[in-house]
Amino acid sequence: MALNILNPGLSTSIQDLGRPGYFHLGIPIGGAMDRFAMRVANMLVGNAEEAAGLEAVFMGPEITFTEDALIAITGAELPVMLDGVEQNTWTALTVTKGQTLSFGFLQSGARIYIAVSGGIDTPVALGSRSTYPIGALGGVDGRNVAAGDMLPVGKAGKAMAGASIAPAHRRMPSNPAILRMVKGLYWHRLTEASGQQFLNDEWKVAPEADRMGYRFRGGKPLEFVDREQPFGAGSDPSNIVDGCYSYGSIQVPGGTEPIVLHRDAVSGGGYFTLGAIISADMDYIGQLQPHTPVKFEAVSMDEALAARKERHNLLDQIRASLA
């Protein structure tokens, strides 16, 4: 069986849960920007949660199916159609051979996830099928999908059409979106007033936000404590001697526009990081559209761990409901 890509939409790529273990070599973890949505889509069609599916940004692709299949659409909300007939999202849908899957205009969120029973079965690169175009890894010969591609699908597992996920289990962006963060090693570089101003300000997602990082604009420039820059750090107070970046780190080049480093981000560099977004909110960031208002909220490590546990418990509930 294969998926025939008639129209790839704006930007559609093959993604799974990523390729951890190579960050020390400068290869990003990659994978779905909204891992929760990717996991749930796979659960609905009977796949392993790490199976590969499609991630579409802002606009869905147009696809025909060479055989009968079970599919699920999760993530952003938008009209989903099979041969022009609207279907439910977050639901296991039966597709018959020759039918065409298409999408309407985005209503909320930013990224759409498409899982098919059996999972997309393209070659594995460093333990993952996830597309990383800069490194030409995964995907279709290292690139996003294009019109005319025939994406192979693996052997289908067991699942029932009609299974669905309740709206209460779906987290969509609020206004403003609240991004919880833990202050980092370089927070002390800010003046006390500037650190508080950063948290008080309302920022907006910049149009440049992508898989490498989400940039934000609109807040006041940061002010730094006067100090002598260490040798090799450069003259700008936002510079450091090169250090490692964790997933979710918040760097602020020049002290003006925060960037949250996401799935395809670099593993290190010479900008200070004032903290990191908690893991429970990283999927949420992947669903923020440009110009969405955002506020950063500082939380403790215990609060961050509690939020992560809450997300894990939610996934356990969904697994149990679909078992």
What are these regions (language model features)?
Residues 1-323:
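Conserved "landmark" site that anchors the functional core of diverse proteins
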